[in-house]
């Protein structure tokens, strides 16, 4: 009888914790309009530009259109996003999305672990004056024709287009 009660308690706690995790992840869901800045392609700084990132059900998406001699549009699709109680974001995704080149083919975006003193993915979301604010730093690379490593990085700060969820 004690084992059944203990098992029931464990199941109840698992359900509660799973529910809390889902609430933490979805309370920040929304479209974040802001500025992509510190955009670097092959180490060369590109101009800042307006863009939107969408966070929905643990997936972060956004697109950086072709800039200058970039081979195409960078399409971020970062899955497995979790948000801790302090707003720190983590991902379990093995890659960051793709780059669509010349409207013909896609190349995978990999996390770049070689950038000095920076993690390949940094994300933070918080409420500021009743509005959700998203801050990102993404260090990535792609392989052109599977041979040439092309590094890139982008930072982003934006505000949610919907009011922050009440705590």
Show the residue positions of the predicted features.
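Edge beta-strand at a domain terminus
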Residues: 23-31, 75-88, 131-167
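Bacterial Sec-dependent N-terminal signal peptides
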Residues: 1-27
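A composition-driven surface/loop motif
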Residues: 38, 95, 122-141
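Hydrophobic lipid-interacting interfaces of membrane-associated proteins
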Residues: 33-39, 65-70, 99, 139-145
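Tryptophan-anchored aromatic micro-motifs
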Residues: 23-46
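Predominantly extracellular/secreted and cell-surface proteins with exposed
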Residues: 45-121
